[in-house]
From Swiss-Prot:
Keyword Lipid metabolism attached: no
GO biological process, any: translation
UniProt protein name: Large ribosomal subunit protein uL16
Family according to the record: Belongs to the universal ribosomal protein uL16 family.
Protein purpose: Binds 23S rRNA and is also seen to make contacts with the A and possibly P site tRNAs.
Gene designation per UniProt: rplP
HAMAP family: Ribosomal_uL16
Keywords for the protein's UniProt record, in alphabetical order: Ribonucleoprotein, Ribosomal protein, RNA-binding, rRNA-binding, tRNA-binding
SUPFAM superfamilies registered for this protein in UniProt: Ribosomal protein L16p/L10e (SSF54686)
PROSITE patterns the record matches: RIBOSOMAL_L16_1, RIBOSOMAL_L16_2
Assembly description: Part of the 50S ribosomal subunit.
Species annotation: Stutzerimonas stutzeri (strain A1501)
GO MF annotations in UniProt: rRNA binding; structural constituent of ribosome; tRNA binding
GO cellular component, one term: cytosolic large ribosomal subunit
InterPro entries to which the protein is assigned, alphabetical: Ribosomal_uL16, Ribosomal_uL16_bact-type, Ribosomal_uL16_CS, Ribosomal_uL16_dom, Ribosomal_uL16_sf
Length: 137
């Protein structure tokens, strides 16, 4: 599972997930990409599940890039614990996603195969996504 090796602080505030993705909104590495259309959070487990779906479908062909990383800790208190007594411990890690963020990229496969693979990966994600091609200027 993806998570930072070390962080400056163990816990973070919840914060707000506003605006559109400025960075990471262009297809940089591969030929085709899966881009988010809605906003939300992706857990490390969801990112990994979609990655597995992609790699299984393309088999040995093609190269895959994961363009998101879960760097925000989410805390949770244990079951049946009363409120108060401080913040809970870190339960899992999430990546905050804004509309327009490229999630996965792929190269070395046909467009038809890439579309099928991204459709399988998108089914594992809690966001609305779209298929995009690299534009050459």
């Amino acid at each position: 599972m993806l998570q930072p090796k070390r962080t400056k602080f163990r816990k973070q505030m919840t914060g707000h997930n506003r605006g559109l993705a400025q960075r990471g909104s262009k297809v940089s590495f591969g030929e085709f990409a899966l881009k988010s259309v809605s906003r939300g959070r992706l857990t490390a487990r969801q990112i990994e599940a979609a990655r597995r779906a992609l790699t299984r479908h393309v088999k040995r062909g093609g190269k895959i890039w994961i363009r998101v990383f879960p760097d925000k800790p989410v805390t949770k208190k244990p079951l049946e614990v009363r409120m108060g007594k401080g913040k809970g411990s870190v339960e899992y890690w999430v990546a905050q996603i804004q509309p327009g963020k490229v999630l996965y990229e792929i190269e070395g496969v046909s467009e038809e195969l890439a579309r099928e693979a991204f459709a399988l990966a998108a089914a594992k994600l809690p966001l609305a996504t779209s298929f995009v091609k690299r534009t050459v200027m």
